[in-house]
Amino acid sequence: MYQPDFPAVPFRLGLYPVVDSVQWIERLLEAGVRTLQLRIKDKRDEEVEDDVSAAIALGRRYNARLFINDYWRLAIKHNAYGVHLGQEDLETTDLKAIQAAGLRLGVSTHDDMEIDIALAARPSYIALGHVFPTQTKQMPSAPQGLEQLARHIERLGDYPTVAIGGISLERASPVLKTGVGSIAVVSAITRAEDWREATAQLLAIAGAGDE
């Protein structure tokens, strides 16, 4: 079977919100979330370093699994729990430096070919998306749906996986029934009428992850 070559993460990372500010990181940690990602796009390292550093410090205070999207140099510098990379970032990132620093690595995938590419890097977890149509970001690929997601899970076996893309409160349970280890959400929390209630309900379904 496939085995990660980066530091391990639990198979069940639980509810995995992806947010764009330190304010959201702090809110969600206080609400009981223990796996989350800071995703700030299209800024220079020096513009985001304070936010990255603050988010990592918060994650450490709560003993949480905080992943930094893309800014891998800053993640290494400030000793983050982990880094998350898109496919387009794999070729331009020093994966050996991330590994040597002891950081976990997550990689996005959208089809079988990208899963092959991710497996070659042997990251800590593989993100599978997008499951449903999403308004959060422009996607060149088509939604995979539950049947395709289940096929990927069967192929990957006990490799840690995260489903992402258009996962709402109503869709969370059907997604988890595919056998995927974790669910990543964005607008299900950040655009909810009551984000605290939405977070509590999603935590009740997906959990906060295994230790």
Curated annotation (Swiss-Prot):
Cofactor descriptive note: Binds 1 Mg(2+) ion per subunit.
Swiss-Prot/TrEMBL cofactor(s): Mg(2+)
A GO term from the CC aspect: cytoplasm
This protein's record includes keyword Transferase: yes
Pfam families for this protein: TMP-TENI
CDD domains for this protein: TMP_TenI
Sorted UniProt keywords: Magnesium, Metal-binding, Thiamine biosynthesis, Transferase
E.C. designation(s): 2.5.1.3
Enzyme class at the top of the EC tree: transferase
InterPro entries found in the cross-reference section: Aldolase_TIM, ThiamineP_synth_sf, ThiamineP_synth_TenI, TMP_synthase
Binding site for 4-amino-2-methyl-5-(diphosphooxymethyl)pyrimidine: 37-41, 69, 108, 137
UniProt: Mg(2+) binding residues: 70, 89
Molecular function as annotated in GO: magnesium ion binding; thiamine-phosphate diphosphorylase activity
Binding site for 2-[(2R,5Z)-2-carboxy-4-methylthiazol-5(2H)-ylidene]ethyl phosphate: 134-136, 166, 186-187
Involved pathway(s): Cofactor biosynthesis; thiamine diphosphate biosynthesis; thiamine phosphate from 4-amino-2-methyl-5-diphosphomethylpyrimidine and 4-methyl-5-(2-phosphoethyl)-thiazole: step 1/1
Catalytic activity: 2-[(2R,5Z)-2-carboxy-4-methylthiazol-5(2H)-ylidene]ethyl phosphate + 4-amino-2-methyl-5-(diphosphooxymethyl)pyrimidine + 2 H(+) = thiamine phosphate + CO2 + diphosphate; 2-(2-carboxy-4-methylthiazol-5-yl)ethyl phosphate + 4-amino-2-methyl-5-(diphosphooxymethyl)pyrimidine + 2 H(+) = thiamine phosphate + CO2 + diphosphate; 4-methyl-5-(2-phosphooxyethyl)-thiazole + 4-amino-2-methyl-5-(diphosphooxymethyl)pyrimidine + H(+) = thiamine phosphate + diphosphate
BP-aspect Gene Ontology terms: thiamine biosynthetic process; thiamine diphosphate biosynthetic process
Role description: Condenses 4-methyl-5-(beta-hydroxyethyl)thiazole monophosphate (THZ-P) and 2-methyl-4-amino-5-hydroxymethyl pyrimidine pyrophosphate (HMP-PP) to form thiamine monophosphate (TMP).
NCBIfam families: PRK03512.1, thiE
Family under the similarity heading: Belongs to the thiamine-phosphate synthase family.
Official protein name in the record: Thiamine-phosphate synthase
Provenance organism: Citrobacter koseri (strain ATCC BAA-895 / CDC 4225-83 / SGSC4696)
Taxonomy of the source species: Bacteria, Pseudomonadati, Pseudomonadota, Gammaproteobacteria, Enterobacterales
